[in-house]
Amino acid sequence: AASDVYKRQMEHHAILKSCEAVEKEGFYVTYIRPAENGIVRLTDIQRAVRPDTFLISVMAANNEIGTIQPVAQIGAFARRHRILFHTDAVQAYTNMDIDVNAMQIDMLSTSAHKLNGPKGIGFLYIREGCVKTPFIHGGGQERGMRSGTENTAGIIGFAKAAQTAMANKPVRTQYEMRMRDYMIHRVLTEIPFSRLNGDSRKRLPGNMNFSFQFVDGGTLIVMLDKQGICASAGSACSTGSGMPSHVLKSIGLPDELSFATVRFTINEEITRQEIDYVVNCLKNDIAQLREQSEDYQNFL
């Protein structure tokens, strides 16, 4: 059997479940754990590769904690060893620089809904010659690789969304990073027992993921919602599961902190005044929840 190498807990369930499926077909899958900052070590991939390894799949940027992976380094390693390299770029596309040739990417997948495009449409880039077997058999659409009538309206909507996102990318991402860093600084300096999950610099422009000790993240989300603030206690795919985030577990975060975690995402429309409002609400809400927390009172 062949080996498919990637970091287990941090990958999106779209990748995790696919790997579980091929394992049942007899393929050997190696799962690699990231470092505490959420970044996979190239040395760990190098150690995990077997003589029969044929595919490495690594998420370009994580949807929960925003960490950006060393895609170019992994791509170069894969190319040297004649291993196919796939990256899940759903979060990264239009938010960071991606060059499939320079990064030696063989396959790249992404989705329109992450850049204000329509839901239900995405694309899979495949370097010519990498894959010869059709995914879906039928009428031979998409050069015979994926049969079925194309979603023309979705394709056009995706193209327009991508065009718009790429046109203002430099200005937009720089602004988002300034606002992101401003909010991170305020939260970490003004709210005791708070921590930022993921790397402080190598992260998506608009992503922030905080854990607030002695606070229930779900309750905090409800309080923020009543104040007009949209936030998340995890990925949209696992909302309501009642399970701690597999991403946070992969970086060694204890379950009690996983359940005390809130994710914020900002875009170019968010103002400094709005961030100040969010941080002030956070401070008040967290103080209120900690007053009611027996663990916090015992800790004091």
Region locations from a protein language model:
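Structural signature of PLP-dependent enzymes
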Residues: 162-185, 195-204
